[in-house]
Amino acid sequence: MSEIKIFHNPRCSKSRAAVSLLEERGIAAEAVKYLDTPPDLSELKDIFNKLGLESARGMMRVKDDLYKELGLDNPDLDNDALLRAIADHPALLERPIVLGKR
């Protein structure tokens, strides 16, 4: 298993560019197609903590129609509620997310 993990959507140009950049630099990475194998709530919490974000919105597609349809723009929602929404609707996960040793 690689020390680098990238949460990847092959249909996303930015995600494809990130994978290409890693390959060009000879960096082996485990590509997780998160729409096919979505992270569960526990893994999302781990990702959130590793990213060091103040708000889970930093790892969400906040401009996506689904985000607004689900009322996730409500400022009263806490990080747990937002992470549960990503677990239930993995398309809300902003990509790419690259995790590994610094």
UniProtKB/Swiss-Prot annotation:
UniProt catalytic activity: [glutaredoxin]-dithiol + arsenate + glutathione + H(+) = glutathionyl-S-S-[glutaredoxin] + arsenite + H2O
Catalytic residues (UniProt): C12
Keywords: Arsenical resistance, Oxidoreductase
GO biological process: response to arsenic-containing substance
CDD domains recorded: ArsC_ArsC (cd03034)
Residues flagged as site, Important for activity: H8, R61, R95
Keyword Oxidoreductase: yes
Major enzyme class: oxidoreductase
EC number: 1.20.4.1
Gene Ontology terms, MF aspect: arsenate reductase (glutaredoxin) activity
Family: Belongs to the ArsC family.
Function per UniProt: Involved in resistance to arsenate. Catalyzes the reduction of arsenate [As(V)] to arsenite [As(III)].
Name of the protein described by the UniProt record: Putative arsenate reductase
Source organism of this protein record: Neisseria gonorrhoeae
Gene encoding the protein: arsC
